[in-house]
Swiss-Prot record:
This is Eukaryotic translation initiation factor 2 subunit 3. It comes from Gallus gallus. One of its GO terms (biological process) is formation of translation preinitiation complex. GO terms for molecular function: GTP binding; GTPase activity; methionyl-initiator methionine tRNA binding; translation initiation factor activity. The gene is EIF2S3. One of its GO terms (cellular component) is eukaryotic translation initiation factor 2 complex. It is found in: Cytoplasm, Cytosol. Signal peptide: none annotated. Residues 457-469 are annotated as: Interacts with CDC123. Residues 39-247 form the tr-type G domain. It is an enzyme of class 3 (hydrolase). Eukaryotic translation initiation factor 2 eIF2 is a heterotrimeric complex composed of an alpha (EIF2S1), a beta (EIF2S2) and a gamma (EIF2S3) chain. eIF2 is member of the 43S pre-initiation complex (43S PIC). It comes from the Eukaryota. Its EC number is 3.6.5.3.
């Protein structure tokens, strides 16, 4: 990549130019044209029960099929988190009625294009660039869903019109986004083409009753058919009007949570042609730039001769940044960003870096091995009905020495409860985690061979370890 000359023209010349030489981070906003031309600045999760059409809705809006892996295609379910970016446009002709004046396209579409609606004039102009985090709806994949929730700004809750509401995962996901303090939710009543009008009305009442008293109370309910792309522009309009652009911090030291990582080299590649590992994630704050020196924590985890955990942070350099197929010179908080580094690709392959935190050297938070948390348990297990009883099983109190699954940011790790008192608990983590006091964590327990969400906590303090650094 030629990056030396000023105002370097990146790939995709039809998109806005980015120039590191003239970059002033204090002037950037989540709607700056040079930012949203190339990358998404809002993350929207799709949540809901398995087979209610989450991936189909994302495909209808963005044109990207989020089911990428062979075993996912065969079983037609999402297993890993799927991602897709979409640009939302609005026609600048005031005579065009809504919702027809809204349109969504893929992320490489130019920022402006002429109208093709008969009887209208003017151009479709880019108003939002959104990243969809397509979460699995399967109960066994709840951990993946929670990892996705760590980066969401808003959620589309999908409910299939041809099934009764709520289905088990629908309530579990709703509780999860409540924990993550997501306030902006759109409810999509999908598969409306499969039911009679009376049935749709009846289910609408069910949905209203179901969301009463939850974060989704008062959320708009939009009847759609994702398969037939019916009412998709209505969804686009609601995304623009109902989901506020999140306030972002562009000036702090950058920090990115890794939610995917891969080795992009093909087998049999010449040594000289090897590329460094790629980390995919969402920037929480700050701006990453091509050429910047970075640190990844906790890095490489090992044990010393006494069995104590040790962490060696990875130091590297950013060689490329991209959002889907768009090259970037700098990346802002928001949608999913791919960071090409000089890290040994074997450390990144097959999502090995998930749960790590990448950022400016020396500016990342501490690495914890034990956490002291104040926690809150759900009263009943979501989605699990006990045999012969219509009510869900009660959540038992935390007991000493039990092993829970803890979700911190995008990391899922085991944690042994070492002490518990009233609403305080101490948890010894299986894997060290780079996090801060005050962060929220989700707790899951193994019930009938599945991990089920049982509550959440907030980090009060913990035991940190000093990272080891090579003395070269």
């Amino acid at each position: 990549m030629a990056g030396d000359e000023a105002g370097v023209t990146l790939g995709q010349p039809h998109l806005s130019r980015q120039d590191l030489a003239t970059l002033d981070v204090t002037k950037l906003t989540p709607l700056s044209p040079e930012v949203i031309s190339r990358q998404a600045t809002i993350n929207i999760g799709t949540i809901g029960h398995v087979a209610h059409g989450k991936s189909t809705v994302v495909k209808a809006i963005s044109g990207v099929h989020t089911v990428r892996f062979k075993n996912e295609l065969e079983r037609n379910i999402t297993i890993k988190l799927g991602y897709a970016n979409a640009k939302i446009y609005k026609l600048d002709d005031p005579s065009c009625s809504r919702p027809e004046c809204y349109r969504s396209c893929g992320s490489s579409t130019p920022d402006e294009f002429p109208t093709d609606i008969p009887g209208t004039k003017g151009n479709f102009k880019l108003v939002r660039h959104v990243s969809f985090v397509d979460c699995p709806g399967h109960d066994i994949l709840m951990a993946t869903m929670l990892n996705g929730a760590a980066v969401m700004d808003a959620a589309l809750l999908l409910i299939a019109g041809n099934e009764s509401c709520p289905q088990p995962q629908t309530s579990e996901h709703l509780a999860a986004i409540e924990i993550m303090k997501l306030k902006h939710i759109l409810i999509l009543q999908n598969k409306i083409d499969l039911v009679k009008e009376s049935q749709a009305k009846e289910q609408y009442e069910q949905i209203l009753a179901f969301v009463q008293g939850t974060v989704a109370e008062g959320a708009p309910i939009i009847p759609i058919s994702a398969q037939l792309k019916y009412s998709i522009e209505v969804v686009c309009e609601y995304i623009v009007k109902k989901i506020p652009v999140p306030l972002r911090d562009f000036t702090s030291e950058p920090r990115l949570i890794v939610i995917r990582s891969f080795d992009v080299n093909k087998p049999g590649c010449e040594v000289d042609d090897l590329k460094g590992g790629v980390a995919g994630g969402s920037i929480l704050k700050g701006v990453l730039k091509v050429g910047q020196e970075i640190e990844v924590r906790p890095g490489i985890v090992s044990k010393d001769s006494e069995g104590k955990l040790m962490c060696k942070p990875i130091f590297s350099k950013i060689v490329s940044l991209f959002a889907e197929h768009n090259d970037l010179q700098y990346a802002a908080p928001g949608g999913l960003i791919g960071v090409g580094t000089k890290i040994d690709p074997t450390l990144c392959r097959a999502d090995r870096m998930v749960g790590q935190v990448l950022g400016a050297v020396g500016a990342l938070p501490e690495i914890f091995t034990e956490l002291e948390i104040s926690y809150f348990l759900l009263r009943r297990l979501l989605g699990v009905r006990t045999e012969g009883d219509k009510k869900a099983a009660k959540v038992q109190k935390l007991s000493k020495n039990e092993v829970l699954m803890v979700n911190i940011g995008s990391l899922s790790t085991g944690g042994r409860v070492s002490a518990v008192k009233a609403d305080l608990g101490k948890i010894v983590l299986t894997n060290p985690v780079c996090t801060e006091v005050g962060e929220k964590i989700a707790l899951s327990r193994r019930v009938e061979k599945h991990w089920r969400l049982i509550g959440w906590g907030q980090i009060r303090r913990g035991v940190t370890i000093k990272p080891t650094v090579d003395d070269d």
